[in-house]
From Swiss-Prot:
GO terms for molecular function: rRNA binding; structural constituent of ribosome; tRNA binding. The keyword Ribonucleoprotein applies. One of its GO terms (cellular component) is small ribosomal subunit. The lineage of its organism: Bacteria, Pseudomonadati, Campylobacterota, Epsilonproteobacteria, Campylobacterales. It comes from the Bacteria. Part of the 30S ribosomal subunit. Contacts proteins S9 and S11. HAMAP family: Ribosomal_uS7_B. One of the primary rRNA binding proteins, it binds directly to 16S rRNA where it nucleates assembly of the head domain of the 30S subunit. Is located at the subunit interface close to the decoding center, probably blocks exit of the E-site tRNA. This is Small ribosomal subunit protein uS7. PROSITE patterns: RIBOSOMAL_S7. The keyword rRNA-binding applies.
């Protein structure tokens, strides 16, 4: 374990929307340091949402999607006297955002649309409308936490 807490690095806001969450999303989307490709995919998806989304802008739908997918509870394994319990714990805000971004990207990659831009746009629209695989993942996490409510007193 490290001696001190790692300093939180400052993330610069993205150049088009001036939004730090979009920068984090682009960084998570990136493979092998190819940031320009990830940026093209992200902005392409937001433009595609602008065309499909009706009266709402792409950036608003993106923000709604992130908010809808953020989990408030999750379960962590805790070993007590030879038995392992799934203990429900609250999720810190930074981790909520990180999990939401991670889930949206991973489920967008598994979709069947042709290009990654289309996959990401469709997943963001689904997430904003409280449906889709990433929303189901959040619901499943809640169900796990609810089912293991009895072990909440093992929190640390």
């Amino acid at each position: 374990m490290r001696r001190r807490k790692a300093p939180v690095r400052e993330v610069l806001p993205d150049p088009i929307y001036g939004n730090k969450v979009i920068t984090k999303f682009i960084n998570s989307l990136m493979y092998d340091g190819k940031k320009s490709t990830a940026t093209t995919i992200m902005y392409g998806a937001l433009e595609a949402i602008d065309k499909k989304g009706g009266e709402k802008k792409g950036i608003d739908i993106f923000n709604d999607a992130i908010e809808n997918i953020k989990p408030l509870l999750e379960v962590k394994s805790r070993r007590v006297g030879g038995a392992t319990y799934q203990v429900p714990v609250e999720v810190r805000p930074a981790r909520q955002q990180a999990l939401a971004i991670r889930w949206i990207i991973s489920f967008a990659r598994k979709r069947s649309e042709r290009t990654m831009i289309d996959k990401l746009a469709a997943e963001l629209l689904d997430a904003a409308n409280s449906k889709g695989a990433s929303f189901k993942k959040k619901e499943d996490t809640y169900k796990m936490a609810e089912a293991n409510k009895a072990f909440a007193h093992y929190r640390w």
